[in-house]
Amino acid sequence: MRAPGFWWSVPTALPARLLAPLGRLYGGQVARRMARPGASAPLPVICVGNVTLGGAGKTPTALALAGLLREIGHEPAFLSRGYGGRLPGPVRVDPAQHGAAEVGDEPLLLARAAPTIVARDRPAGAALCAAADATAIIMDDGLQNPSLRKDWSIAVFDAGVGIGNGLAFPAGPLRAPLAAQWPHIDAVLIIGEGPAGEPVAADAVRRGLPVIRAQLRPEPGAAAALAGRPVLAFAGIGRPDKFFESLRAAGAEIRATRAFPDHHAYRAADLAGLERLARREGLTLVTTEKDRVRLPAAAPVTVLPVSLHFSEPDAALLRARLAALGPAPPDPRTRPD
């Protein structure tokens, strides 16, 4: 779905006021669900979630945390519901066999970095993570899902939009009232620059929660290859404009853009239309990694990969917090006979 513009406006906007009663009902139901006790997992569970619907940068955050876990000796596995995929799981994602229609787009990206389990039944998925010889689980999304007990939850916020109008769906972007979600959050991560993230940061500090800041940066080689090139940029993610901004920052000359709904299942007609326009205008088709896995392998599309970067003090804080969840077990290959 595409987020309606009034979500990012004031809460007194007419559509928001009309939908506010439904938002109170929906948000209250989610809040009550979040309060249920969850099953214990065989491994420490780190939840990367957000308080709003749509993209905030959870997948790059999960990948960055996996790197930090490896630095302190852990072997992470990712656990995902597999949004947009038809397989209920639990199943280990194999990019050579699975497509986005089966397991969703994010799991295909995560599986490049570590064992990735798709499971609508999160406790069953956690058991399969343990069977994959992981020592820690990174749950991509799931802050509002109570089925699995989390050891540490980090809420990701986009500094450009924050919590929007502060109302619960469908009146606004919140999955539940923010006051009901704070007790389930152990740290706040604000990605990018913008004033909308500052009220969230101030609220977190008042609650004694650490506030970590990070930036999404394009892969240098890919950015250099696009510098000065005329492009047709397209994306079906939570905030396509963020991707277009990244392309401009990389020096690409954006001649046209096309925004699709988040997790859009591209049809042959979509791609054919994009290719026609690109050929006619002499443009390079460019999209995100997440969109690329939803396209045919032979599609003539260039990708601009991005990754999340922390300052060293924030990276050190994260390493310390992750280490506090428990030491990684010794590698059996290093044990003396």
Curated annotation (Swiss-Prot):
It comes from the Bacteria. Pathway: Glycolipid biosynthesis; lipid IV(A) biosynthesis; lipid IV(A) from (3R)-3-hydroxytetradecanoyl-[acyl-carrier-protein] and UDP-N-acetyl-alpha-D-glucosamine: step 6/6. The keyword Magnesium does not apply. Keywords: ATP-binding, Kinase, Lipid A biosynthesis, Lipid biosynthesis, Lipid metabolism, Nucleotide-binding, Transferase. Disulfide bonds: none annotated. GO terms for molecular function: ATP binding; tetraacyldisaccharide 4'-kinase activity. Signal peptide: none annotated. ATP binds at T52, L53, G54, G55, A56, G57, K58, T59. Pfam families: LpxK. It catalyses: a lipid A disaccharide + ATP = a lipid IVA + ADP + H(+). SUPFAM superfamilies: P-loop containing nucleoside triphosphate hydrolases. One of its GO terms (cellular component) is plasma membrane. Belongs to the LpxK family. PANTHER family: TETRAACYLDISACCHARIDE 4'-KINASE (PTHR42724), TETRAACYLDISACCHARIDE 4'-KINASE, MITOCHONDRIAL-RELATED (PTHR42724:SF1). Transfers the gamma-phosphate of ATP to the 4'-position of a tetraacyldisaccharide 1-phosphate intermediate (termed DS-1-P) to form tetraacyldisaccharide 1,4'-bis-phosphate (lipid IVA). This is Tetraacyldisaccharide 4'-kinase.
